[in-house]
């Protein structure tokens, strides 16, 4: 999808659609101009109550040929109501309105559209408040591009008669202010790149486990590298993983007939030969049965999403490539299946991790931390500035935080603060959880250095405590995305989170 900026007006702009906005019970500037040209039909929609003052409510307005309006159609979208004596509008209302516009246009025959959201920055307009801070036109443009790109995503891979792709291919951000027009250009590029990264993450997550295997992820890494000279990739197979002494990782992989893979992608958009990279580590369990500690059958199909951490690393890399980001990032994926078999690990088995620490496997369904702990040891060789692991790690995090916030743990507060700020800026928030020594005792084992579970109390915290024992040599953060990586129910599918958070962090790290 192509994004442009242009100084234009809704009357003379020829496009498939003009998107204009209402706020409170009034039309914004461009909508008012169109209302005059179209005989008051927009204001009538407001007065009649057909378009309610709720964020995201929208209405198609017919454009008669004799009106002089060059757009083929008009979409009127409501931004909701202002607050504090009409001086502020919540950023969430703006997001809802843009989301609604993107969804409507992706389902329409319009091939291009012009969006007049810049009316929110006219003199006397209310301030857009984003978690206590004012949001500028660049932030709005970034969110707009991201939302339009993600609205265009369709999962078609395994349908015999796939749904056709949306017609929309070009979106123009209209503004009559030259300074703002220049400012939003890079924001549109960033938002579109993040949207493309999120769509890759969604696609990988949505694929079934019989297609998206560890070997398939290796091929995806090769495809990214083939398209970008700044990205190199390599992978280690299961024998090489075992030879490195990654006993925890191998204990998970050995139950499957499919070879595990450790995938390394290095994007070098900045820095010399000795520059320290930021490292992303993704949990890539392409299907999780629970192993010998078998999961219940209900909803087990959703365990194809257990590689959401790996998918988000791919998505972040894709976004960095798309925007030609000036950063040095290494993404490492621990890819395996967790399957029951005669070779699979059993509850009570004890393995030696790459770090030399021994682990009693009390539950084979706590496998994510086993593949991650060895990968976190492996990445020490890169002498990283920071390491962020991303994993659909615990159901306990879903109980604690639901499906809105990603759980964040860190051994360095400065790193945690950067990630929290990145999440707020990207509208992809995380919430910091405790990583206190008090919880470490729950991992005690009578037979090994530690157990791989710490009991039901504070399960997300003890999982993070387990990982923290393998991250002593660098600043580290853990993102538990079990509640945010996918949706269940009628809208079942990968969300593309936390790609926005990760990219925002890496660009400002």
Swiss-Prot record:
GO biological process per UniProt: proteolysis
- The catalytic residues are 295, 369
Keywords from the named record = Aminopeptidase, Cytoplasm, Hydrolase, Manganese, Metal-binding, Protease
Cleavable signal peptide:
none
Binding-site residues, Mn(2+) 1 = 288, 365, 367
Cite the PROSITE patterns for this sequence: CYTOSOL_AP
Q: Where, in this chain's numbering, is Mn(2+) 2 bound? A: 283, 288, 306, 367
Catalysed reactions, semicolon-separated: Release of an N-terminal amino acid, Xaa-|-Yaa-, in which Xaa is preferably Leu, but may be other amino acids including Pro although not Arg or Lys, and Yaa may be Pro. Amino acid amides and methyl esters are also readily hydrolyzed, but rates on arylamides are exceedingly low; Release of an N-terminal amino acid, preferentially leucine, but not glutamic or aspartic acids
Subcellular location per UniProt equals: Cytoplasm
GO annotation, cellular component aspect: cytoplasm
Q: How is the cofactor bound?
A: Binds 2 manganese ions per subunit.
Q: Which GO terms describe its molecular function?
A: manganese ion binding; metalloaminopeptidase activity
User: Which InterPro entries does this chain map to?
Assistant: Leucine_aapep/pepB (IPR011356), Macro_dom-like (IPR043472), Peptidase_M17_C (IPR000819), Peptidase_M17_leu_NH2_pept (IPR023042), Peptidase_M17_N (IPR008283)
Query: What Gene3D superfamilies would the database entry show?
Result: Leucine Aminopeptidase, subunit E, domain 1, Zn peptidases
Q: Which cofactor does it need?
A: Mn(2+)
- The enzyme's first-digit EC class, named in words, is hydrolase
**Source domain of life:** Bacteria
The EC number on file is: 3.4.11.1, 3.4.11.10
Q: Which family does it belong to?
A: Belongs to the peptidase M17 family.
The record's function comment reads:
Presumably involved in the processing and regular turnover of intracellular proteins. Catalyzes the removal of unsubstituted N-terminal amino acids from various peptides.
Q: What name does the UniProt record give this protein?
A: Probable cytosol aminopeptidase
Native organism = Teredinibacter turnerae (strain ATCC 39867 / T7901)
Tell me the gene name. Answer: pepA
């Amino acid at each position: 999808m192509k994004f442009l900026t242009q100084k234009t007006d809704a009357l003379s702009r020829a496009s498939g659609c003009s998107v204009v906005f209402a706020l409170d019970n009034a039309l914004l500037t461009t909508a008012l101009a169109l209302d005059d040209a179209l005989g008051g039909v927009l204001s009538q929609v407001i007065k009649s109550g057909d378009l309610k003052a709720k964020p995201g409510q929208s209405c198609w307005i017919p454009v008669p040929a004799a009106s002089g309006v060059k757009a083929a159609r008009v979409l009127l979208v409501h931004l909701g109501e202002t607050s504090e004596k009409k001086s502020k509008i919540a950023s969430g209302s703006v997001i809802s309105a843009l989301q609604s516009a993107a969804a409507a246009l992706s389902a329409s025959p319009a091939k291009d559209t012009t969006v007049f959201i810049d009316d929110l920055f006219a003199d006397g307009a209310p301030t857009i408040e984003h978690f206590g801070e004012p949001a500028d036109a660049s932030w709005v443009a970034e969110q707009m591009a991201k939302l339009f790109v993600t609205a265009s995503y369709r999962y078609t891979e395994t349908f015999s008669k796939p749904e056709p792709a949306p017609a929309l291919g070009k979106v123009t951000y209209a503004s009559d202010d030259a300074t703002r027009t220049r400012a939003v250009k890079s924001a549109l590029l960033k938002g579109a790149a993040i949207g493309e990264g999120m769509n890759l993450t969604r696609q990988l997550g949505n694929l079934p486990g019989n297609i998206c295997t560890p070997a398939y992820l290796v091929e995806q890494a090769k495809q990214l590298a083939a398209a970008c000279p700044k990205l190199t990739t390599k992978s280690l197979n299961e024998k090489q993983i075992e030879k490195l002494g990654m006993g925890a990782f191998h204990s998970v992989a050995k139950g499957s007939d499919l070879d595990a893979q450790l995938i390394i992608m290095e994007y070098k958009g900045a820095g010399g030969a000795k520059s320290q990279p930021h490292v992303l580590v993704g949990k890539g369990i392409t299907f999780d049965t629970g192993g010998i500690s078998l999961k219940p059958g209900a909803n087990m199909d959703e365990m194809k999403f257990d590689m959401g951490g790996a998918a988000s690393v791919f998505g972040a890399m894709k976004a960095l490539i798309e925007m030609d980001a000036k950063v040095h990032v290494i993404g490492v994926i621990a890819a395996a299946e967790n399957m029951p078999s005669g070779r699979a690990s059993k509850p009570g088995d004890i393995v030696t991790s790459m770090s030399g620490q021994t682990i009693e496997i009390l539950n084979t369904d706590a496998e994510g931390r086993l593949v991650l702990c060895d990968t976190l040891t492996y990445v020490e060789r890169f002498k990283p500035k920071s390491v962020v692991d991303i994993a659909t790690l615990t159901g306990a995090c879903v109980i604690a935080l639901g499906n809105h916030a990603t759980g964040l743990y860190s051994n360095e507060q400065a790193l945690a603060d950067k990630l929290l700020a990145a999440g707020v800026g990207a509208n992809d928030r995380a919430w910091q959880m405790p990583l206190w020594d008090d919880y470490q005792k729950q991992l005690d084992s009578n037979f090994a250095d530690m157990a791989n579970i710490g009991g039901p109390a504070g399960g997300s915290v003890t999982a993070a405590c387990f990982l923290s024992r393998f991250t002593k040599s660098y600043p580290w953060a853990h993102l538990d995305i079990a509640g945010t990586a996918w949706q269940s129910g009628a809208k079942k599918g990968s969300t593309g989170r936390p790609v926005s958070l990760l990219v925002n962090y890496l660009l400002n790290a």
